[in-house]
């Protein structure tokens, strides 16, 4: 339920909003262990996601209110396999998942000249697969790699509030990456410099996002694209007193690569941060 007043930069008189909605959802999941190392899992669900406060009433500046938003309704299915195996003193884990989603009344951010707002987009269908491998390579070295491919398509037959055929039906959804991958390596060692109660972590993480469209690809000459990106982070953590005192430092976007958000905004470039954490016991 919501009882409030909303307005935007164009309207000086706030509009009263008083509404109450009810809905339901259902889900079921199961898993089956084929062997000691191999686990299968599956789930189906009909979910309802209520709009958040930010989506409904905006932020009073860049995001205009949208008091008439409907909840998202999604029919989802997932199926996957997980392989766990001890290797020496460590663990090898391999996981593969496939997923499907049919979303109605999808809540999507739409940019305007001055203010953007969240609107109910309509219908969207998703097929996808994701895979991840994690392993303790040695007692002091850990690594992981994962990748996701997802095919999200507009399934609206008509344009909103009209009988005009939707020219983007069947096209890939814009502003959402369809292929992305991550990888990382971590070195960790206890009492590397002698003594007791110490731990050192040196880690690096890399992320890759393939080029994707800023808007619907309604023409083969569509050039509004969000470019391919690669980001590399490097961090160091040193703790003493059995984790009671921790010093950490991190370099984000170490190579100062040009990155862009899903709406083609450039985020900050290379950044360095440092933290000290003390735990009271």
Regions found by a protein language model. Give the residues of each.
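Signature of Gram-negative outer-membrane beta-barrel scaffolds
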Residues: 1-38, 50, 159
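Transmembrane beta-strands of outer-membrane beta-barrel pores
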Residues: 1-4, 44-50, 57-59, 85, ...
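Residue-level signature of outer-membrane beta-barrel architecture
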Residues: 22, 30-33, 46, 71, ...
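Membrane-embedded beta-barrel scaffold of Gram-negative outer-membrane proteins
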Residues: 33, 39-45, 71-127, 148, ...
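Short loop/turn motifs that connect adjacent beta-strands in outer-membrane beta-barrel proteins
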Residues: 37, 86-92, 140, 190-200, ...
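C-terminal beta-signal and adjacent terminal beta-strands/loops
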Residues: 48, 99, 143, 202-281
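Gram-negative outer-membrane beta-barrel transporters
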Residues: 94, 98-102, 119-213, 255
């Amino acid at each position: 339920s919501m009882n409030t007043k909303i307005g935007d930069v164009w309207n000086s008189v706030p509009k009263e909003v008083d509404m109450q909605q009810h809905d339901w959802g259902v889900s079921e999941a199961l898993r089956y262990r084929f062997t000691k190392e191999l686990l299968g899992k599956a789930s189906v669900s009909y979910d309802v996601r209520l709009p958040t406060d930010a989506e409904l009433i905006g932020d009073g500046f860049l995001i205009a209110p949208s008091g008439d938003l409907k909840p998202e309704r999604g029919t989802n299915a997932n199926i996957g396999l997980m392989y766990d195996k001890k290797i020496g003193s460590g663990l090898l884990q391999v996981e593969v998942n496939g997923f499907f989603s049919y979303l109605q009344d999808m809540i999507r951010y739409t940019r305007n000249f001055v203010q953007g707002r969240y609107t109910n987009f309509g219908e969207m269908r998703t097929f996808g697969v994701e895979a991840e491998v994690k392993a303790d390579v040695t007692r002091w070295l850990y690594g992981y790699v994962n990748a996701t491919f997802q095919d999200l398509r507009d399934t609206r037959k008509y344009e909103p509030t009209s009988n005009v055929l939707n020219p983007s039906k069947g096209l890939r959804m814009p502003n959402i990456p369809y292929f992305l991958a991550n990888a990382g390596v971590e070195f960790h060692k206890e009492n590397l410099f002698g003594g007791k109660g110490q731990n050192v972590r040196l880690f690096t993480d890399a992320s890759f996002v393939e080029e994707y469209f800023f808007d619907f690809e309604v023409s083969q000459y569509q050039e509004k694209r969000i470019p391919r990106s690669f980001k590399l982070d490097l961090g160091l953590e040193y703790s003493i007193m059995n984790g009671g005192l921790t010093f950490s430092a991190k370099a984000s976007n170490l190579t100062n690569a040009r990155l862009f958000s899903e709406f083609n905004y450039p985020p900050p470039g290379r950044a360095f941060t440092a933290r000290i954490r003390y735990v009271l016991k």
